[in-house]
A protein has these predicted regions:
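Conserved, well-structured ligand/cofactor-binding cores
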Residues: 1-454
Length: 454
């Protein structure tokens, strides 16, 4: 491998000749040989956006000239497109402020910009990082990445699953089945009503995420090192938020209090709480579906789900609810990530949180897993659900909880006696009620209509 020599304030470093990073990135590679978790590409993309926005803001305020702006913008466009992803090698387990990742971006954009300009025009600190600090750029990149990931990737997946549930609600209108509470038989419910509960869970948690996005669209940029805005020209914070908005097509604003924006990660904790709520709901939905599909002969068997692959290496013909299992594992991981995000966010000592890389790593993993998991769950399972009407009707009419319909006519205590007798003697509710003398056959038939109990 060929190398070139790069310098920083600590001296010279050998850097691979074909890489755009420089001395500080190389030092990080040598000092933090920990794990294989590369800084998320969503963060690299966000850095491309914020560095381009910062250059535009600095240009508007007369801090850089046209030539520098042009070179920076062109280099940033390559970062944004992902063309330069191979030049961002740093792991998550680095300085807690993300300083090395910020310098990685500064060095790559400067060296690529100089190559584009055909001369040594740009300096990583003096030009690419002008009016900025790692302490305000990394939190800004976190928010940009979080917003784009949720709005561009997660919301479309949620919307498709909601649409599928709406279709299933309509297709299954009029089908009445036994409800269940405590894993025990309960009063009747229509299959459409049950599905509507699943659908509304997704609608509610999407609404929670939309509320969380309000805080995530506030940017720390302009606070520099400790929130005071040292070395930042007047109007920079507002200008850079405007430029980020233009580049993303999303309305970002500058954070009202930069001291809070640097040391607290409230917005990410709040948003991840909504992701956790979504995961909890998906866990419940996937569990309901696999319970309802259990069988084929010894389970509930009230719905059919797609048969996607063989389920056992030893039991021929077995088919398992694999998409439900995958979805529930995703939910477990997201719920676990919430603990890491919350704990890391509590470590904002004095003017800066220094657990930011692990916060955004877990946050973006949660969004990615949920977006992909929901799409797979929808496409390979939920969209193919069909009702086993015969089994639903059989279970409904065998349910002892239908006795609840008799409460207004024979009273709670007599209804309980009827249910206990039917269960003990393995006879129908009708037979038990008549045998106990509470109603005649004609009276029973007149008042007992399970399909009307919903």
């Amino acid at each position: 491998m060929e190398y070139r020599i790069e310098k920083d304030t600590m001296g010279e470093m050998q850097v691979p000749a074909d890489r755009y990073w420089a001395a500080q990135t190389q030092r990080s590679l040598q000092n933090f040989k920990i794990g294989g978790e590369i800084m998320p590409r969503e963060i690299t993309h966000a850095f491309g956006i914020l560095k381009k926005a910062a250059a535009r803001a600095n240009h508007r305020l007369g801090k850089i000239n046209d030539e520098k702006l042009s070179a920076i913008e062109k280099a940033c466009d390559e970062v944004i497109s992902g063309e330069l992803n191979g030049h961002f090698p740093l792991v998550v387990w680095q300085t807690g402020s993300g300083t090395q990742s910020n310098m990685n971006a500064n060095e790559v954009i400067a060296n690529r910009g100089n190559e584009i300009a055909g001369k040594k025009l740009l300096h990583p600190n003096d030009d690419i990082n002008k009016s900025q600090s790692s302490n305000d750029t990394f939190p800004t990149a976190m928010h940009i990445a979080a917003v784009e990931s949720i709005e561009n990737n997660l919301f479309p997946s949620i919307d498709v699953l909601i649409a599928t549930f709406k279709r299933l609600e309509k297709e299954n209108e009029g089908i009445v089945k036994s409800g269940r509470t405590h894993l025990q038989d309960a009063v009747p419910i229509s299959f459409s009503q049950e599905i509507s509960g699943w659908r509304n869970m997704l609608e509610k948690t999407k609404g929670m995420l939309e509320l969380a996005l309000v805080g995530l669209k506030e940017l720390a940029l302009g606070g520099t090192a400790v929130g005071t805005g040292l070395n930042t020209p007047k109007g920079f914070a507002e200008a850079v938020a405007e430029e980020v908005s233009v580049l993303t097509g999303k309305k970002f604003i500058t954070a009202e209090n930069k001291y809070h924006a640097l040391t607290s990660k409230d917005e990410l904790v709040f948003a991840h709480g909504a992701l956790k709520a979504l995961a909890a709901n998906l866990m419940k939905i996937a569990n309901d579906i696999r319970w309802l599909a259990s069988g084929p002969r010894c389970g509930l068997g009230e719905i059919f789900i797609p048969e996607n692959e063989p389920g056992s290496s030893i039991m021929p013909g077995k088919v398992n609810p694999t998409q439900c299992e995958s979805m529930t594992m995703v939910a477990v991981q997201v719920i676990a990530n919430d603990t890491a995000v919350g704990m890391a966010a509590s470590q904002g000592n004095f003017e800066l949180n220094v657990f930011m890389p692990v916060i955004i790593y877990n946050f973006l993993q949660s969004v990615r897993l949920l977006a992909d998991g929901i799409k797979s769950f929808n496409d390979n399972c939920v969209s193919g659900i069909t009702a086993n009407k015969e089994k639903m009707a059989h279970n409904l009419h065998n349910s002892l909880m239908l006795v609840t319909a008799l409460n207004p006519y024979i009273g709670y205590e007599n209804a309980a006696k009827t249910a206990k007798k039917a269960h003990k003697e393995n006879i129908s509710l009708k037979e038990a009620c008549i045998s106990l003398g509470f109603l005649t056959e004609e009276e029973f038939d007149k008042v007992f209509h399970p399909e009307q109990m919903i």
